[in-house]
């Protein structure tokens, strides 16, 4: 069973969101997503300063199995990317909720977080997917 930390919010496309200081958000892919992808070998991070729209792809992760888009959970501006992943994309497989985070963004409207799933909602969605 995949790890689903209770303190995070989730998207239907398997991204997780952690609220950081000053209302900023840290974003990554869930344990479930990295398990489905398999060994991650390459990532294409978004550029700092880029404005992203909710539910629109903003970066790509490539694994030995497939390439997968990553979607922005809310609208906002990319303020930081995890450059460690450029040389160590396997951190996403090893520590998807910690060192494997993808980017940080400053949301345009923090109320957008209310439409994301909580841990139970995400677990129920995974169970329904089979």
Swiss-Prot record:
Single GO biological process annotation from the record: glycine decarboxylation via glycine cleavage system
Gene Ontology CC terms, in alphabetical order: cytosol; glycine cleavage complex
One Pfam family named in its UniProt record: GCV_H
Domain Lipoyl-binding: 24-106
Record's cofactor remark: Binds 1 lipoyl cofactor covalently.
Cofactor list: (R)-lipoate
Record-stated family: Belongs to the GcvH family.
Quaternary data: The glycine cleavage system is composed of four proteins: P, T, L and H.
Function, as annotated: The glycine cleavage system catalyzes the degradation of glycine. The H protein shuttles the methylamine group of glycine from the P protein to the T protein.
PANTHER family: GLYCINE CLEAVAGE SYSTEM H PROTEIN, GLYCINE CLEAVAGE SYSTEM H PROTEIN-RELATED
Name of the protein in its database record: Glycine cleavage system H protein
Organism from which the protein derives: Nitrosococcus oceani (strain ATCC 19707 / BCRC 17464 / JCM 30415 / NCIMB 11848 / C-107)
Lineage, highest ranks first: Bacteria, Pseudomonadati, Pseudomonadota, Gammaproteobacteria, Chromatiales
């Amino acid at each position: 069973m995949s790890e689903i930390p209770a303190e995070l919010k989730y998207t239907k496309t398997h991204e997780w969101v952690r609220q950081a200081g000053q209302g900023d958000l840290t974003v990554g892919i869930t344990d479930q997503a990295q398990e489905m992808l398999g060994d991650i070998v390459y990532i294409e991070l978004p550029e700092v300063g880029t404005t992203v729209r909710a539910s629109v792809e903003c970066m790509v992760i490539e694994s030995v199995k497939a390439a997968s888009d990553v979607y922005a959970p809310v609208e906002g501006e990319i303020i930081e990317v995890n450059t460690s992943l450029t040389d160590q994309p396997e951190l996403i497989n090893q520590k998807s909720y910690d060192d494997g985070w993808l980017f940080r963004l400053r949301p345009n409207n923090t109320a957008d977080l209310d439409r994301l799933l909580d841990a139970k909602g995400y677990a129920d969605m995974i169970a329904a997917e089979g």
